Amino acid sequence: TDRHERFFLRLISKNTLLYTEMVVDEAINRGDKKKLLEFNINEKPVALQLGGSSPKLLAEATKVGEDFGYDEINLNLGCPSKKVEKNRFGACLMKEPNLVADCLSKMQSVTKLPVTIKTRIGYDDVEDYENLHSFISTLKATGVKTFIIHARKAMLGKFTPKQNLNIPPLKYEYVYKLKKDFPNEEIIINGGIISVDEIKPHLEKTDGVMIGRA
């Protein structure tokens, strides 16, 4: 979802919140900020998705994102790739809820924008609902109000990113239950949803739908 695709998507939908590709915090803090973050005003509303695990570096990147005019800052806790795991961000951070909470607290302390998260229902052999509930509870305590849940677990180091988009079974019921258990939070469902007809039933049980592939 680079700026060119987002411009095209905005022509199709005038109101949908669009997201950037995941951008690593250090790339923003040390790299060409304009090249990485500049976007056309017509793309708005648009969220900047960050990858990282350092509260300090994520906070710095969050502030840069706010200064560039983004409408939301999203922390990626769902990417399962080996490269991402090696650098300690993405889905592997589901193993470290307290670190994630520290990151989110620091990010929120430097911005007035909403800070949100995108994650999965579990990882490897950890896929029980109780663990997901505990993870979300820990993050909720920081003040985060919006949780985007890919209704598959992440198989870390075992599947390719493409396989992780298809092989782990979808468990939409986990996301529905999260909404029941966290009625005051915004719970958005993601995973395997590719048409408007498929969206409608999910909207009866969650607050929104994210489409990554269609």
Feature-to-residue mapping (PLM):
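Flavin-dependent oxidoreductase catalytic cores
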Residues: 1-214
